[in-house]
């Protein structure tokens, strides 16, 4: 199970913490980083157990779980840009009058109204979440869906993929198996996303690649590796330095 699945299957308290305990490991829900329980980690002369070291990892990498979550695509948070900004200011501990001055929004009472609106949104979310949990117990016909990558951008209908559909697409375009060559790259955008996410599994998370290394891996997949590489960057699966000297697999 990749970290996107772990993220979406985690409970509220686990998400607030930013990591889960899985067997003998502590797993980061934000990027999949794992630390072994029972091992003492040393950093700058200080010793940490696995959980404390994970909290340090989250703090150094993202600032906080709040900072990570607030930066997700609005299709995933359900927040408008305006609501997102207000939540950040509330989280910083600013008072209504200070926020009004900072944003130029109406008056302090206007900010209080926004607080009420967010509280109402929270109540609705709790009820909806409970309804969906109850629905899972009764709806035996719901298809298994492929989880949306946590770091996905421009989330739209392309991400509306069932597991059955995903398997059919991979079988069609990788006739000799997903570790073989791609039959063609001429396909609808939704299918491109499925195929590109599968190709991304050929890269190692956290490893830095030079362009020739990227090209060599993609040539094993498809002759027009330049087009595949470009799409992987456009779809946010690969990232690179501005000069193209280094590439790496983006966090999903």
Where are these regions (language model features)?
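Short acidic, hydrophobic short linear motifs in intrinsically disordered regions
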Residues: 205-218
């Amino acid at each position: 199970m990749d970290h996107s699945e772990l993220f979406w299957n985690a409970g509220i308290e686990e998400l607030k913490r930013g990591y889960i305990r899985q067997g003998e490991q502590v797993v980061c829900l934000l990027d999949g980083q794992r630390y072994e329980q029972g091992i003492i980690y040393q950093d700058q002369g200080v010793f940490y157990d696995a959980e404390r070291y994970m909290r340090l990892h989250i703090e150094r990498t993202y600032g906080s779980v709040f900072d990570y979550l607030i930066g997700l695509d609005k299709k995933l948070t359900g927040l408008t840009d305006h609501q997102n900004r207000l939540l950040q200011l509330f989280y910083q501990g600013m008072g209504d009058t200070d926020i009004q001055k900072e944003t130029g929004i109406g008056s302090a009472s206007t900010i209080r109204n926004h607080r009420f609106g967010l509280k109402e949104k929270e109540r609705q979310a709790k009820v909806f979440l409970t309804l969906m949990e109850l629905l899972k117990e009764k709806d035996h016909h719901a298809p298994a869906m492929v989880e949306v990558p946590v770091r996905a951008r421009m989330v739209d209908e392309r991400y509306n993929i069932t597991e059955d559909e995903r398997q059919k697409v991979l079988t069609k375009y990788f006739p000799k198996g997903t570790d073989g060559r791609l039959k063609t790259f001429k396909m609808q955008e939704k299918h491109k996303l499925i195929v590109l996410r599968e190709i991304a599994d050929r890269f190692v998370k956290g490893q830095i690649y030079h362009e020739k290394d990227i090209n060599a891996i993609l040539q094993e997949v498809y002759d027009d590796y330049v087009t595949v590489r470009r799409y992987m960057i456009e779809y946010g699966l690969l990232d690179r330095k501005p000069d193209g000297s280094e590439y790496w697999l983006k966090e999903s």
